[in-house]
Amino acid sequence: MKIFKCYFKHTLQQKVFILFLTLWLLSLLKLLNVRRLFPQKDIYLVEYSLSTSPFVRNRYTHVKDEVRYEVNCSGIYEQEPLEIGKSLEIRRRDIIDLEDDDVVAMTSDCDIYQTLRGYAQKLVSKEEKSFPIAYSLVVHKDAIMVERLIHAIYNQHNIYCIHYDRKAPDTFKVAMNNLAKCFSNIFIASKLEAVEYAHISRLQADLNCLSDLLKSSIQWKYVINLCGQDFPLKSNFELVSELKKLNGANMLETVKPPNSKLERFTYHHELRRVPYEYVKLPIRTNISKEAPPHNIQIFVGSAYFVLSQAFVKYIFNNSIVQDFFAWSKDTYSPDEHFWATLIRVPGIPGEISRSAQDVSDLQSKTRLVKWNYYEGFFYPSCTGSHLRSVCIYGAAELRWLIKDGHWFANKFDSKVDPILIKCLAEKLEEQQRDWITLPSEKLFMDRNLTTTS
């Protein structure tokens, strides 16, 4: 019996030791990031040149050149089966993009970073210089996606406000601060919110940026708000041309509320932690809300807008707007009715009459979102994947996205389809170059015709 107890004791000790050793080895392997040192063959590096360079934190040092999968973006645009097939093959691989600490590393030296990304080669026209645009970027994750978005919309004559969620990871915050330090026309919002989904804090984040942008010395004409999974569909030259056509009007979705959305602002909502979730959500109570102040008629739409500076100045100096904001604090997703309603308030700059027809998300060029229940009716099927009924676009949609006519689109994710983002950025740079060089070439031809005649 004594021998059995002794044997049992030693066996238990051995099991504990083996368990401890296994956990220690797993932690060590994770710390060393073995996947980067000895990657498997079926991977795809989204940023091959950077991921194998000394400019990032998590460097792939033993990657064979065969991992570098070349795709022709012109072929993707023309929907050539071979190139579309390549993009589908890449999606079957383990897609590895730069992590937040990689963005921190590559933006730690601003001169090197700007050279790596070719900011000095960005072309700008006289028309763009005289028509600066402001941006409000409300972000919380995936620093590399935000970095790509900023690179795509960057123009030295524009102004950019970044609002990052106070709850965001520290590494993400450092990456955003680094980006802002590298440019005189990019800054972090002076007041940062802890943003909760469908809560007033999301609207407040944009308002914080708008307030800061009004204090800027850059006299911007319009402001556009975006999130980290958005991407432009127009070059800056084309966007300036489109904004000029507005002639002081605003561009956003504004429709009469369907019955399914009435509860959002007719009942009091309280922010509560949802069971089995790691988030807080505004939960409807049985307490009815009073009618909106000043006989304001509610319209609904999107959280995203294109607003004139005159409109933005007005809302910060108008008591009706302030009262309406206070009334909206306990509603569900107030950012989806706040702007859509204000644009209908009589006397506001760029006003749309209450009796005017609805402006749907398809009519407003602000932002293209493909909902799965409208696919096949209003737009072709999604070739990527879906998240909460919203399409994350695939490479086969490149041509449609550019030709559709919207100015921005959502959602993009490099882990779903990195080729689409790469090719869209390439196409926008090509369009910017073509639009800027075209006038000079046309002028040259006109002069030649005049000389020969």
From Swiss-Prot:
Residues 35-453 are lumenal. Its main location: Golgi. One of its GO terms (cellular component) is Golgi membrane. This is Beta-1,3-galactosyl-O-glycosyl-glycoprotein beta-1,6-N-acetylglucosaminyltransferase 4. It comes from Homo sapiens. It is an enzyme of class 2 (transferase). It is a single-pass type II membrane protein. It catalyses: a 3-O-[beta-D-galactosyl-(1->3)-N-acetyl-alpha-D-galactosaminyl]-L-seryl-[protein] + UDP-N-acetyl-alpha-D-glucosamine = 3-O-{beta-D-galactosyl-(1->3)-[N-acetyl-beta-D-glucosaminyl-(1->6)]-N-acetyl-alpha-D-galactosaminyl}-L-seryl-[protein] + UDP + H(+); a 3-O-[beta-D-galactosyl-(1->3)-N-acetyl-alpha-D-galactosaminyl]-L-threonyl-[protein] + UDP-N-acetyl-alpha-D-glucosamine = a 3-O-{beta-D-galactosyl-(1->3)-[N-acetyl-beta-D-glucosaminyl-(1->6)]-N-acetyl-alpha-D-galactosaminyl}-L-threonyl-[protein] + UDP + H(+). InterPro entries: Glyco_trans_14. GO terms for biological process: carbohydrate metabolic process; inter-male aggressive behavior; kidney morphogenesis; neutrophil homeostasis; O-glycan processing; protein O-linked glycosylation; thyroid hormone metabolic process; tissue morphogenesis. It is found in: Golgi apparatus membrane. Residues 1-13 are cytoplasmic. Glycans are attached at N72, N286. Pfam families: Branch. The lineage of its organism: Eukaryota, Metazoa, Chordata, Craniata, Vertebrata. Disulfide bonds join C73-C227, C161-C382, C182-C209, C391-C423. Belongs to the glycosyltransferase 14 family. One of its GO terms (molecular function) is beta-1,3-galactosyl-O-glycosyl-glycoprotein beta-1,6-N-acetylglucosaminyltransferase activity. Predominantly expressed in thymus. Weakly expressed in pancreas, peripheral blood leukocytes, placenta, small intestine and stomach. Barely detectable in liver, spleen, lung and lymph node.
